[in-house]
Amino acid sequence: GLSHSGMHTLGKALFGAEEILSGSVHANGKNIKHTKDAIKAGVGYTSKDRDYESLCLQSPIIDNITSTGYEKNRAFGPFISRKKEAEYCQEQIDKLQLKCASMYHLVSTLSGGNKQKVVFGKWLAADSKILILDCPTRGIDVGVKANMYKMIYDMKKAGKAIVFISEELPELVGMSDRILILKDGKVSLEIARKEGFSEHKLIEYMI
C-alpha cells in the first residue's frame, strides 16, 4: 500500500506493539496482546525505522543480537553465560556474513545493510518462526539489496513464515506468494501468485 495506508500500523499490531481496538491476533495457538506474547509465540519484527525501534545504536552488536536470547544463554538461575552469549552472537555474524571488526563494536558504527543484518540476527538466533519485515530494504544501497533478498528467500526455504511489508511494488511482485493491498486501513485486494501479479492492477487498488 501507500505510506499512509495503515500497513506499518498493521505490522506493529501483529507484533503486539500497537493497541488493537477490535479483533485479535493469534500465532502458534497464542493470543498476541503484547510484544512479549509475540516473542514467546515465535514472532519477530523488524521496524521500518530500525535505528529507533529495532536497534540500540549505542550498544555493542553482541548486546543487540542476544537481546532476545535470554533463555538460551543462561548459566544458572538468573545469570547469563558470557561464553554462551559470545558463541550465540558469533554464529549469527558468520551465518549472515555481517561485516564488523568485533562483536563488541557499537551498532552505530555499522552500514545500513549490516545494521539490518543485526536485526535479522537477533530474531533468527531466537529461532522465530514468523518474521514481520517492515520495509527491510529501506535505506540500503542497490548492491546490498540483492543480498537481503537472498537472505529473506533462505529464511522462507528454512520454513519461516514471512510477512513482507513494502511500498515498492517490484520487490513485492518478485518476492511474494500472496499480496494484500491496503487502502485507507482496509484490505482492498488479496491475490495469489498463481492468479498472476500485475503491477498495473496492484496500483489500481492502492490509489
Regions found by a protein language model. Give the residues of each.
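Glycine-rich phosphate-binding loops of nucleotide-dependent enzymes
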Residues: 1-207
